[in-house]
């Protein structure tokens, strides 16, 4: 009897160890994301780039506005401390690439935040309310989407001048449009679910249903699209700056540095290679992370 009792206790302990704990959606997504080597490696590289643009100007012996008149358009040199070289005005390129990276990343992340907040609320309300309200809201979206964006930017620059705030306004105006469409499509399928109908029967207000029930259930799609939107907005800001419609002196961004480097590419190729390298690597990292999040959060792959 003693032996059988010990055996039963051993079996119970062993079965408890073998018991598989249930995982939530986000725990399962994190596990799947960590198994994606390209996404994890991209996340690490992106973290290092963010660390570089934050810390490098603080550790450098040169400031953003310092000019070395004796080393104008100088090639990268370890002895002088100009590790990325200097531009035509003798300013340290490493510091300028780091400061420009701050602005480019800030624009991309800010555009993604605008898309997440405005696009999610607009799309979820449109999809949930349905009927004529949905039709009107979608027609308004189509009008905004068909508006020539470059013409809009030129008008802003003409009337208000060039500054970084206009870049945020201009890019924020278009970043949320596709997000609203995606969230609306998800909401149309969600509002027929039993838990939404139960909330309606229980007298829960429309605002509470949207914020407490619909928005949390579309966050997976929102996170994936936001991660893929950041590189698009960084590239768009770089394009505007390259055309001279974006950030201007004394501020700079990777796009503005590319524009300066392209003008002197034959005699000073480092002015183009360093900002272009950081821009390309950052865009690839965001895209790999977005692909990893999409694979991790896609319910079809479960």
Residue ranges and their predicted role:
Residues 11-29, 79-92, 129, 207-208:
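Short, membrane-interfacial amphipathic segments enriched in basic
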Residues 30, 34-47, 105-109, 266-273:
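Membrane-interface helix starts
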Residues 8-13, 52-88, 243-251:
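Hydrophobic alpha-helical transmembrane segments of membrane transport/permease proteins
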Residues 2, 59-63, 232-235:
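Proline-centered turn/helix-capping motifs that create local helix->coil transitions or kinks
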Residues 38-57, 120, 280:
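Short, strongly hydrophobic transmembrane alpha-helices
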Residues 33, 51, 143:
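Residue-level signature of catalytic and energy-coupling elements of molecular machines
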Residues 88-302:
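Alpha-helical transmembrane segments of integral membrane proteins
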Residues 1-44, 289-302:
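Transmembrane alpha-helical segments of polytopic membrane transport and secretion proteins
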């Amino acid at each position: 009897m003693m032996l059988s009792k010990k055996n039963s206790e051993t079996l119970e302990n062993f079965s408890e160890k073998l018991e598989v704990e249930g995982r939530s959606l986000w725990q399962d997504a994190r596990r799947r994301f960590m198994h994606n080597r390209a996404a994890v490696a991209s996340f690490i590289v992106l973290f290092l780039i963010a660390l570089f643009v934050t810390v490098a100007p603080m550790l450098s012996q040169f400031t953003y506005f310092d000019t070395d008149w004796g080393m104008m358009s100088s090639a990268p040199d370890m002895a002088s401390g100009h590790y990325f070289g200097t531009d035509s005005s003798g300013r340290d390129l490493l510091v300028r690439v780091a400061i420009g990276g701050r602005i480019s990343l800030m624009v991309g992340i800010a555009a993604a935040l605008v898309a997440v907040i405005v696009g999610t609320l607009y799309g979820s309300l449109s999809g949930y309310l349905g009927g004529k309200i949905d039709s009107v809201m979608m027609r308004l979206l189509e009008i905004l989407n068909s508006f020539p964006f470059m013409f809009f930017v030129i008008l802003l620059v003409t009337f208000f001048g060039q500054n970084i705030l206009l870049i945020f306004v201009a890019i924020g105006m278009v970043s949320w449009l596709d997000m609203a469409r995606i969230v609306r499509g998800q909401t149309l399928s969600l509002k027929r679910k039993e838990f939404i109908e139960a909330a309606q029967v229980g007298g829960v207000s429309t605002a509470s249903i949207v914020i407490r029930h619909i928005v949390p259930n579309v966050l997976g799609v929102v996170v994936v699209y936001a991660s893929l939107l950041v590189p698009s907005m960084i590239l768009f800001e770089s394009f505007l700056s390259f055309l001279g419609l974006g950030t201007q002196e004394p501020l700079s961004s990777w796009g503005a540095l590319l524009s300066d480097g392209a003008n002197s590419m034959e005699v000073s190729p480092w002015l183009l290679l360093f900002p272009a390298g950081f821009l390309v690597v950052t865009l690839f990292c965001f895209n790999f992370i977005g692909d990893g999040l999409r694979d991790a959060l896609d319910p079809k792959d479960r």
